[in-house]
Amino acid sequence: MKTILLTGGGTAGHVTPNLALMEHFRDKKWNIHYVGSQTGIEYDLVGNLSIPYHAIATGKLRRYFSWQNFIDPLFILLGFFQSLLICLRVRPDVVFSKGGFVTVPVVIAAWVCRIPVICHESDTTPGLANKLSTPFCRYVCVTFPQTAKFLPPGKVVVTGSPVRDAITRSDPDLGADYYPAISGKPRLLVFGGSLGAGPVNQQVEIAVPELVRNFNVLHVVGTGNLNAVLNAAFDSGKGYRQVEFIQDEFGDVLAAADVVVSRAGANSIYELILLRKPHILVPLSAAVSRGDQIENAKIFSAEGYSQVIDESELNPASLLKGLDELMAQIDQVKDKLAEFERLDSVGRIVALLEEQVV
């Protein structure tokens, strides 16, 4: 029986594509192992699944000064030796890395053990972890063709982003149950991602009295961010509902939405376009990120797929104005989204991984 070792973590975008691949390798009766951190979101998303989860020490690849930069190399080194032991014990036939700082020691350890490694980059520009991992990978799969110019040409394979069956086979009728049930109003889904939801939540909460005039609003605020007072004041009977997190049913919820406000992570954009959902993107600011979401948003705005509001310009007035403009041209936006080429991303990546197994 063949064995695959998956790794990725730090944000949901570095984990959910791995979940999509797990579904298919389970069907193929492969042994599946996962390497992540003990405290990252990957532990929450994968740790409770019926697969072996190996936690390793991790540092953080920062682009700014911090005293922790002096001790993190020690954690990364420890993570490398832990990964080396995992590779020797598990002996995977192939390793798939989705990115995030936890993956770097895993990729290098696999390379030392002569285990083939495939990496995947979701964003339009490669993250630091994937830049460091690329020399040790046989191939780097990319979601968007624009990413290829930043990587060695002989290693790039355009695959799209792996999307879970829960997204591609979603049921809008099931998802509708999550939304406030006021007939005649379109459903608005707002979610800020696993990180950086705060600024979006703040402005949306201020705008709620105006939003509920025109929408049934489902607001996914993130773990620990629930505003119980607001949730009670504007309950489902008044057109607004907050939830902290949606995992298994998220595909159904997304399918039921008429319009979406989202961060501009590559996986989120890919799912929105795949399901033909008119949307407004609010990219994370460069002050708290490497600017990848800003670049993602620029490209898809230029292509006509996405409407964008910069985080610095996000306020109730700009949000309401953006939604009014989007609803006024919603049919044209849907027609444009229908032009997007759907790739069998999971199939392409699975085939590439299988080719590496001798």
Q: Can you describe what each PLM-predicted range is?
A:
Residues 3-9, 26-75, 192, 312:
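Conserved nucleotide-sugar phosphate-binding/catalytic loop shared by glycosyltransferases and other
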Residues 325-328, 342-358:
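C-terminal alpha-helical cap of glycosyltransferases
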Residues 93-94, 255-270, 277-278:
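Acidic donor-binding loop of glycosyltransferase active sites
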